[in-house]
Amino acid sequence: MVQRISLKNKLLPDLVEIQRASFKWFLLEGLTEVLEIFPKISDPTSRLELQLFGNEYKIKFPRYSVRQAKNRDKTYSAQIYVPAKLTRKDIDLPSKNQEKNIKSLDLSSTHLQLSAEKQIKNKKYKKRLVFIGDLPIMTNRGTFIVSGTERVIINQIIRSPGIYYKQEIDKNGKQIYSASLISNRGSWLKFEIDPKGEIWIRIDKTHKVNAYIFLRAIGLNKDEIEKGLSKYAFLISASQIYSVKELAKEIGKNNIEEVTDEEALLIVYSKLRPNEPATVAVAKQMLYSRFFDPKRYDLGEVGRYKINKKLGLNIPKTFRVLSPQDILSSIDYLINIKDKNSGNLDDIDHLGNRRVRSVGELLQNQFRVGLNRLERIIRERMMICDIDSLSLSNLINPKPLIASVREFFGSSQLSQFMDQTNPVAELTHKRRISALGPGGFNKDRAGFAVRDLHPSHYGRICPIETPEGPNAGLIGSLATCARVNVFGFIETPFYPVNQGQVIYHNSPVYLTADEEDDFRVAPGDVKVSKQHYIEGDIIPVRYRQEFITTTPTQVDYIAISPIQVISAATSLIPFLEHDDANRALMGSNMQRQAVPLLYPEKPIIGTGLETKIARDSGMVVISRTSGHVNYVSANKIGIQDNSGRTVHYRLKKYYRSNQDTCINQRPIVWVGEKIVVGQTLADGASTDGGEIALGRNILVAYMPWEGYNYEDAFLISERLVYDDLYTSIHIEKYEVECRQTKLGPEEITREIPNVSDNSLKDLDRNGIVVGGSWVEAGDILVGKITPKGEADQLPEGKLLRAIFGEKARDVRDTSLRLPNAAKGRVVKVRVFTRQKGDELPPGTNAMIRVYVAQKRKIQVGDKMAGRHGNKGIISRILPKQDMPYLSDGTPVDIVLNPLGVPSRMNVGQVFECLLGLAGGYLGKRFKIIPFDEMYGAEASRALVNRKLKEASLITSNKWLFNDQHPGKMQVFDGRTGEPFDNPVTVGRAYMLKLVHLVDDKIHARSTGPYSLVTQQPLGGRAQHGGQRLGEMEVWALEAFGAAYTLQELLTVKSDDMQARNEALNAIVKGKPIPKPGTPESFKVLMRELQSLGLDIAVHKLKLFEDGQRRTVEVDLMSDSKDNRVDRSNYDTPPVDDFEQFLY
């Protein structure tokens, strides 16, 4: 097993290679490719010509380093310069006399041409470098810094360009055969044979044209069609119904074979543009631009490769538009499927038909869009502006390209704010594969087939790691050993097998899903002898998407490892094969949410990939040279290499991550230590000794305890709090801008009106909090005053100044204060001003950023989880002495509910905790590879029992292993000291503290902001909102008959503005609370109905003096104290009433 783990680590690729390799391809090939197809642009008179030399582009060194870009909110980018040449052609037009002489002379055309050439004087200009835009540069960790934040471009999996054949059933239950020809860019073509046997070609899913007519229109004559089709008679007979019904109407012919090329072109044009007059030249141009023009249509290298492979063609891969041969062969293949049942139908969900677009290709497409905009702008300028005044600088405007790239990085679905909670989250984010985004699926319309697992996913896309919500199956993760080839297809490695013997000495063979289909492939957990022969008579294999069995001699390939099927995060789960897939999915996803702890600890039970994942995530510092350590401090490590040169490595100290967790690197080498290339020099967040350390190994017991672990709740010992086992640091960023207002500039100052000296104790002389200060909710971080206008001032202030003529400072306090429920230590203060050379937004004079670090101990309400999907909320923290304890007096750290195991079927947690217990007593750590049945039946159970027995013998603790109840032991109640009735499963499990902390979620409101329109309290913690009393809560109160409580909740406590104020006064003065009025939201509803033209009003019955009851309209919009006149009705008044206004 040890040998297999070391071998596997060598075979694992660099886990972030998919990002780096793609961006490298973009810089070397992708950008050149898109710049080279930029056309020569001439003005309408052909006097001016612009040419770009894309293959000679230059990239300037980035202006800011990665660290500076992050600190200053800048983009880590480089400027792109392209050599360009602007050529002016001065044409001397001949005079009238010269024209007469030319006409009278009988000269040959060649002579005329030569004389015209002499009159054109070319003014050639040298090539000059022109700035065309900024390109964000990828950091060595595979991320981009955009406006100071770290972002990741995730990989997109889309339908590959090519041709796909399928068989469908129409609504009448009859079969339809169709073929879709999908391009990378341009129109789609669909060939179909309908239930009547007619062959049609659909262009862009709408316009339908007869197949024979289309073949004639693209320039094939009758003989070429007959020669190219093996079933020419089928095509002609399929067109008979069309000939009789439609052809006669269109061109007056009954035989389709008599149609000429020109007639066919006009028919196709009339179908595509039915309301436009058709000419042969226009029709030809339109058809050419649709399918044969490289600017408008592109199959891509992949599309050409797939079409050649499917149809058996030998068209060069550089020919990336359609050829008549493609269309003819496509129809021939379709007829053969229908008529002979030869040829293969395609499965669109097969990974051979789906390809990955990584960052390089996505950026290339965005550059193409930007360059198209640039071309359009250049042409417009050439037409509008005076040609003599044009130069390269005012012709080529970098803005369209800059805007296009900014749009992609800022708002594309595939450009995401990096998940930096811990190294696993970071690495998984870079290896994520999404079927969403431009050109992909929509999560609302994606069906089950797209989301489902497919046999071709084996070793390519992880079957376990995917989200739980509406994106399930649409977002996945690349498997550990998978890589993406030049065409974008995912490959996975296999060892070849020859006559039952596995050939290990060669490098493994990487196969795509298409190539793998033709071979019998055995899984990685098949037992192999020391002589490398496959053991056993019957071997399970995959062959042509089916799971079958065969003999060892018939096996063609074998998987290199059992973990090549799963993703990096899933491969960290030990005993994975004993967990239900749903729970393993939760375990994989929750590892990404684990908060980096103050004192991380590597797991006793691992899988062997912890070191690889920590290294590839970029969280640890790795030596680039061999040598010895000559300097170590908390901030820097110096390594002297063999040539005597010292290389310094700067460490990150208390950096804030995107998720407000703390990134802090700690040296793990000492002065004088010898170092080799690739050795880990410093640990980062969630790493310990160069290995991933997301949580802690703690003692768990599976037993009920007074109902405190009901419904997955956890009961924990106060040891976890006092010993800081689950304490984490969180760093919040607070920012304030000092702006230039109409009334004057805002000021950062210590002189704040109406503030006590005690509130200013932590501020320096400029009014900014001092680093290292302890601050609590409401404390001033930055003192700021804003000029106040006359309108802002209170009436008493105006009166005082009117009387005494006193000109007090007309300012108001707009200081930055620490928000509610926050406290901590100020770790960093950054001040940005123009005087220091910082770039600030217009109207901003200064910007101050304060970073506050907070230590959060574990508490009731925090969420914890294991690696097997066993999650729960802490319900109670018990004193150490009250916790159940073992026979040697060790108190348990956490009590879990045993009922959480059987129904969830995640038995891996039991194996893990028991082997962890043995490892804790033996002082050993174990690396367990999943799928260990190759070592024999019940291998996991045998290993756990053996190690427990070994631990009980070595430590002389016989209670550790009980033959009658293996894995269970006597546990005592900490409160009484008496043993519990039954033996209890106790072990050492690896538990994580998740980012869902109660401090970030707990919320209460007494008074707060209200919505302007409805006058109801706002919702949500961020807005300091209230809890919504919704429909169902109203039903509950109605059912209970709590009428007055309900009325109060719907009026005074909600949106009855007048009653709200009156109630407050009544409470203050100790008077009875008055009756509520009409809620504001009811008035809004009334106004909305009135705005629709409905005469809607509220009436009340009133008793008049004559003893009659009549309805009187109530004006809800007026204050109840106002005696306003009732709203008039809409009856027309008599004419007499208007006579007084006539004169």
From Swiss-Prot:
GO terms for cellular component: chloroplast; DNA-directed RNA polymerase complex; mitochondrion. It catalyses: RNA(n) + a ribonucleoside 5'-triphosphate = RNA(n+1) + diphosphate. It is found in: Plastid, Chloroplast. Its EC number is 2.7.7.6. One of its GO terms (molecular function) is DNA-directed RNA polymerase activity. Pfam families: RNA_pol_Rpb2_1, RNA_pol_Rpb2_2, RNA_pol_Rpb2_3, RNA_pol_Rpb2_45, RNA_pol_Rpb2_6, RNA_pol_Rpb2_7. PANTHER family: DNA-DIRECTED RNA POLYMERASE I SUBUNIT 2. DNA-dependent RNA polymerase catalyzes the transcription of DNA into RNA using the four ribonucleoside triphosphates as substrates. Belongs to the RNA polymerase beta chain family. In plastids the minimal PEP RNA polymerase catalytic core is composed of four subunits: alpha, beta, beta', and beta''. When a (nuclear-encoded) sigma factor is associated with the core the holoenzyme is formed, which can initiate transcription. NCBIfam families: PRK00405.1, rpoB. This is DNA-directed RNA polymerase subunit beta.
